[in-house]
Design a protein with these regions (language model features):
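FAD-site-proximal beta/loop scaffold in flavoenzymes
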Residues: 7-9, 147-163, 252-298, 302-303, ...
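N-terminal glycine-rich dinucleotide-binding loop that anchors FAD/FMN and/or NAD(P) in oxidoreductases
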Residues: 42, 48-50, 57-84, 155-156, ...
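Residue-level detector of alpha-helix initiation sites
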Residues: 26-27, 137, 176-177, 294-295
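N-terminal FAD cofactor-binding segment of flavoenzymes
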Residues: 27-42, 73-77, 84, 133, ...
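FAD-binding core/adjacent interface of flavoenzyme oxidoreductases
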Residues: 2-20, 89-167, 274-278, 282
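Short, well-ordered coil/turn residues at beta-beta hairpins
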Residues: 24, 126-128, 132-134, 139-141, ...
Length: 326
């Protein structure tokens, strides 16, 4: 990968210098912070405090923590980090810019901050930066969808389908991978209806394949969802017809949260995610990515945490010139 970076405008980071700045306080960022702290690196974690899974009541598939509320998992992780004096967490703080520098003392980056908490400096200088900001998501424009999201409507089959198995389920989406997601969800139920909400997300060949598998494809536009206290009970179509369901999944449109990296020439894929090698190195030396900020795979906390731990090990090895693939 290229070693090039663009030098940006000067930002005063005097007095605040660390080995690594981690942008993002989710499972990838916190896991990396723990492992970097244990490697005696000085670390700052910048956490805006807006996790994508904030609406989720229970997280699943995390070994020893199956069913834990995601906010509780973050609380436990933060308590563990408190034991490492070389790790600091800047709460309610956003990164407004990531700039390269040619400092003689090895500080290759300046991370400009916008903090709402007390004692947040305007910037931090760092030898390396790990981007673990995850994704932003946009849900289909269904009025009451948010009322059920994270309770009986979910986005991750691997995370939440077990609790919905053998029920009448909906899959709602407007993206071209909807048929593939339907085939995945069908592992857990034989009563699945795919709602394209008036879009052409499922083509005629895919519809025939899904129908042959017992999956119903409903192309009419959705008016709204029905239910009480987060428990969805029906999809109401624009013509007034109701399709009763007992839960379901939605396919959001995901967008990388990377507005702050525009000053660096970081390679992106066609979806705007950061391109990395298998160890989390981006196209700019000293900048790494973990979790969904890089090309996303399974949307699970344990996967993101594992990627953060691997990136931490690679950062430590790279800092002493020990090249490793990990």
């Amino acid at each position: 990968m290229s070693d090039s970076a663009h030098t940006g405008p000067t930002v005063d980071a005097s007095g605040t210098e660390v080995d690594v700045v981690i942008v993002g306080g989710g499972p990838a960022g916190l896991s990396a912070a723990l492992n970097l702290g244990r490697a005696r690196a000085s670390v700052v974690v910048v956490d805006a405090g807006r996790p994508r899974n904030a609406a989720t009541l229970r997280s699943h598939g995390f070994l020893t923590r199956d069913g834990i509320p995601p906010l509780e998992l973050r609380k436990l992780a933060r308590a563990e980090l408190a034991a490492y004096r070389n790790v600091r967490v800047f709460d309610r703080t956003a990164v407004s810019g990531l700039l390269s520098t040619d400092s003689a003392d090895g500080m290759r980056f300046v991370v400009a901050l916008q903090g709402r908490g007390p004692g947040i400096p305007p910037a931090v200088a760092a030898r390396s930066v790990l981007i673990a900001t995850g994704l932003r998501e946009t849900l289909p424009g269904i009025p009451s969808l948010r009322a059920y999201y994270g309770v009986t409507i979910f986005s991750c089959a691997a995370c939440d389908a077990w609790e919905l198995q053998d029920r009448s389920l909906a899959l709602i989406g407007e993206t071209t991978d909807l048929a593939a997601r339907a085939r995945l969800i069908a592992r857990w139920t034989d009563r699945l209806t795919v709602f394209t909400n008036g879009s052409d997300a499922v083509d005629t060949v895919e519809e025939a394949e899904l129908t042959a598998s017992g999956i119903v494809v409903e192309r009419r536009a959705i008016d709204d969802l029905e239910g009480e206290r987060g428990a969805v009970s029906a999809v109401r179509l624009a013509d007034g017809e109701r399709v009763e369901i007992e839960g379901g999944f939605v396919r959001p449109q995901w967008h990388p949260a990377l507005d702050f990296v525009t000053a660096l020439d970081l390679e992106r894929d066609r979806f705007g995610n950061l391109v990395t090698d298998r160890s989390g190195r981006t196209s700019v030396t000293g900048v790494y990515a973990a979790g969904d900020a890089a090309s996303p795979g399974p949307q699970q906390l344990i996967v993101a945490a594992g990627q953060g731990a691997r990136a931490a090990a690679v950062i430590v090895h790279d800092s002493i010139g020990v090249r490793t693939a990990h």
